[in-house]
From Swiss-Prot:
Gene that encodes it: udk
EC number(s) reported in the record: 2.7.1.48
Pfam family of the protein (one): PRK
Coiled-coil segments on the chain, per record: none
Membrane-spanning intervals of the chain: none
Protein name per UniProt: Uridine kinase
UniProt GO molecular function: ATP binding; cytidine kinase activity; uridine kinase activity
Amino acid sequence: MSEKSQCVIVGIAGASASGKSLIASTIYNELRAKVGDHQIGVITEDCYYNDQSHLSMEERVKTNYDHPNALDHDLLCEHLEKLMKGESVEVPEYSYTEHTRTENTTTMTPKKVIILEGILLLTDPRLRDLMHATVFMDTPLDICLLRRVKRDVEERGRTMESVLKQYQKTVRPMFMQFIEPSKQYADIIVPRGGKNRIAIDVLKAHIAKLLKA
């Protein structure tokens, strides 16, 4: 994106449990000292899953959460555009146990740097146009699956059986249909997950360059 704005938006995409959150938090923590604690923020695409409060729990669990239609990219684009104009937004809060948004929101004030992370970011041309730099976490799917099982069982109240069933039914097929093809839109492709030190340093240097532009 070439248009001058009040903030730099960096998008980090890739498979579920590929290391997106880890690399986003690492860059966030390491850049705070340079740009200021209140001048960098992270937005997770998961927060923009559709509000399903009108559906029963039985209907909610049937949703294909790995398909672009499960996400409210209209609202995400609207919020990013407002932040770029120097306006604050109310980021939704999503509950993984209730499979819908909660009544709570988090106020996001304008920042110099916004790190956006999510599985389907690069599939939407509107989002790609708003990003100043794009990253794809190219982590092997077997590694992602192991991480996903551990995370969803320990942190999201899931059973191993339900995680594996979802992986076979939607996660892997949607990765092959939507996420993997979106890799072509990445400026930087990161192998070996979120602990890739060289990739982190390259990203930080690129963000610093964008801030000076």
